[in-house]
A protein has these predicted regions:
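HotDog/MaoC-like acyl-thioester-processing domains
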Residues: 1-15, 102, 109-156
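Non-catalytic linker/capping segments at the edges of enzyme domains
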Residues: 1-56
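Short acidic/polar alpha-helix capping motifs at helix-coil junctions
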Residues: 14-18, 69-70, 84-85, 96-99
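A generic structural signal for short beta-strands and their flanking turns/coil linkers
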Residues: 16, 31, 40-42, 61, ...
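Short, solvent-exposed coil/turn segments
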Residues: 28, 98-100, 130
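A conserved, well-ordered hydrophobic junction motif at loop->secondary-structure transitions
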Residues: 43-79
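Hydrophobic residues in beta-strands and at strand termini
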Residues: 46-48, 107, 153
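Hydrophobic beta-strand-centered segment that forms part of the acyl-chain substrate-binding groove
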Residues: 75-118
Length: 156
């Protein structure tokens, strides 16, 4: 059973595993992306800074890919916690951290600047240490990119 809402997954990573540029709580120069488990999906929000401009008014595609990457590994960790009956609201750290094995990104529409971006993740499947997550990145209800990640749970 999925939890209604959770603490931010990245805030539950142990300090020694929380330095990622995109989502690490210990990387003050990074994006500080926060992924939340809400029902049976994950959600994150991000407002891109002007320094991430590609063409005028549009977000650089590398940022889109890196947001999907970090949201995907956070989502994978959340879904493993659910499978292992770890209540994210009852722990200070989680024993689960995932890394990217494969990331596929399809760009569907230009991603606008000046708009909060919403990322969503849905569990596709878990097989052993492999976790597949489907994702979307949208702006104002327009899907700008879709992604699929194969994340690997780091060995204990």
């Amino acid at each position: 059973m999925m939890h209604n809402k959770s603490k931010a997954i990245q805030d539950l990573y142990p300090d020694e595993l929380a330095h990622c540029y995109g989502c690490g709580k210990n990387n003050l120069d990074g994006y500080q992306l926060k992924t939340y488990l809400v029902g049976d999906e994950t959600i994150a929000h991000f407002l891109p800074d002007e320094k991430f401009t590609a063409l005028p008014g549009s977000v650089y595609g590398g940022l889109v890919a890196s947001l999907l990457d970090c949201h995907g590994t956070g989502s994978a960790a959340a879904f493993v916690c659910v499978q292992e009956n770890i209540n994210l609201n009852e722990v200070e750290t989680i024993p689960v951290r995932c890394v990217t094995a494969s990331l596929k990104v399809d760009f569907k529409a230009p991603t606008p600047m000046g708009v909060e971006l919403k990322l969503r993740g849905k569990l596709q499947s878990i097989e052993g240490r492999k976790i597949w997550v489907d994702m979307t990145l949208s702006a104002d209800d327009t899907i700008c990119a879709t992604g699929e990640i194969l994340a690997i749970k780091i060995k204990d």
